[in-house]
Curated annotation (Swiss-Prot):
This is NADH dehydrogenase [ubiquinone] 1 subunit C2. It comes from the Eukaryota. It comes from Macaca fascicularis. GO terms for biological process: mitochondrial electron transport, NADH to ubiquinone. The gene is NDUFC2. Accessory subunit of the mitochondrial membrane respiratory chain NADH dehydrogenase (Complex I), that is believed not to be involved in catalysis but required for the complex assembly. Complex I functions in the transfer of electrons from NADH to the respiratory chain. The immediate electron acceptor for the enzyme is believed to be ubiquinone. GO terms for cellular component: mitochondrial inner membrane; respiratory chain complex I. PANTHER family: NADH DEHYDROGENASE [UBIQUINONE] 1 SUBUNIT C2-RELATED, NADH-UBIQUINONE OXIDOREDUCTASE SUBUNIT B14.5B. It is a single-pass membrane protein.
């Protein structure tokens, strides 16, 4: 098992993550997790042999809200880990520019062959 980089017990997001913008409330990942909450309510009704779509609408709303809330923080954590990874990668690229040299840019005229229409 790989140890964590900065092991801090009971810390979901460090204070450093507060500088990142929050995820949008209409983020497709959040809407997908909310839909999974709705599906969890349907499965719960199916398991307990209740009418699948019509029984316990308050339970459906509870599942949707809970899944959406958890998904929000999971998306926020994912964005933070990607930001840390990007910062480390760009820092490495600044320290080792010889490994990431710029290639000479070619125009499309140099890449493609001459076009001769055939009629």
């Amino acid at each position: 098992m790989v140890p964590r980089r900065n092991p801090e017990p009971l810390r979901f997001l460090p204070d450093e993550s507060r500088s990142l913008p929050p995820p949008k409330l209409t983020d497709p990942r959040l809407l997908y997790v909310g839909f999974l909450g709705y599906c969890a309510g349907l499965v719960d009704n199916f398991i307990h042999r209740r009418p699948i779509r019509s029984a316990g609408l308050h339970r459906h709303l509870l599942y949707i809200t809970a899944f959406y809330f958890v998904g929000y923080y999971l998306v926020k954590r994912g964005d933070y880990t990607y930001a840390v990874r990007d910062r480390e990668m760009f820092g490495y690229m600044k320290l080792h520019p010889e490994d990431f040299s710029e290639k000479e840019k070619k125009t499309y005229a140099e890449i493609f062959e001459k076009f001769h229409p055939i009629r």
